[in-house]
Curated annotation (Swiss-Prot):
EC top class, as a word: hydrolase
Catalytic activity: a 5'-end NAD(+)-phospho-ribonucleoside in mRNA + H2O = a 5'-end phospho-adenosine-phospho-ribonucleoside in mRNA + beta-nicotinamide D-ribonucleotide + 2 H(+); NAD(+) + H2O = beta-nicotinamide D-ribonucleotide + AMP + 2 H(+); NADH + H2O = reduced beta-nicotinamide D-ribonucleotide + AMP + 2 H(+)
Residues reported to bind a divalent metal cation 3: E190, E194, E235
Subunit architecture: Homodimer.
Pfam families for the chain: NUDIX, NUDIX-like, Zn_ribbon_NUD
Species the sequence originates in: Pseudomonas syringae pv. syringae (strain B728a)
Protein name per the record: NAD-capped RNA hydrolase NudC
Any one Gene Ontology molecular-function term assigned to this protein's record: magnesium ion binding
Cellular component GO terms held in the UniProt record: cytosol
Cited HAMAP family: Nudix_NudC
Domain Nudix hydrolase residue range list: 141-264
Amino acid sequence: MSRPERWTTAVLDVEAPGGLAVVQGDQGFLLDANGVMFPRGWLAGQDLPVQSEHGIGYFEGEPVYLLVLERSVAVEGCAWQGLRQFMLEGDFAVFQMLGYAAQVSTWAREHRFCGACGRATVQIRGERAMFCEHDNLRLYPRISPSMIVLVTRGDEILLARSPRFVTGMYSALAGFVEPGESAEDCVHREVMEEVQVRIKNLRYRGSQCWPFPHSMMLGFHAEYESGEIVPQAEEIEDARWFHVDDLPPLPANRSIARYLIEAYLAERSGAPEPVLPG
């Protein structure tokens, strides 16, 4: 999959003049009728409670910075919108930019102080890292690898729902990779833990950044081998086989979960394969 051209990440010098900025507070990202990117000079005059600033990349060639606020505040003519809403609608390249910004913001908030000694850290110029001088310790943004797998049995697909899902929605099985575990081992383990089913013919299908708050989703397809579905207590509210012509409400169109399902439906029908966003 080719790298997105409209949005590219970079470590920019916050001392450089000009450019645009996105603003994140505890209510999401600031936006107005023109979008989420504001001239840095204009933002400097808004008396915002800025906790930190980061140069995050280029959007259509324009340098973009991130202002992380101590809290969300009212700005005339503007509103706040959560990251998930940007994922569901609008320009996907903007969501990619904001997803990156959100992960940088999470990292900056969580590593203001050293976890070893408790002293304040400083940003390393030209590198996406915080530094504790006392412990000579570099602290990088956290990325949590996780897997998501669509298990199929001919014209049936195995879908499950978590108690956290919106009412009626089902999705593919997913879980986090454990230390010392390969992604493939994780798939087999999670499927067994969540529904007591054995799988075979595992195929990697693609990956997607999932900035809620810092996951990297590794997508797989697998075929059913054996076992009867037994949902994992407290984790899985319901799990069952669905015929491809009679599916329940599914995850958002731009999610890797939806892509895995749509890709299998296309494969069964001979339709063109969908494109995985991101």
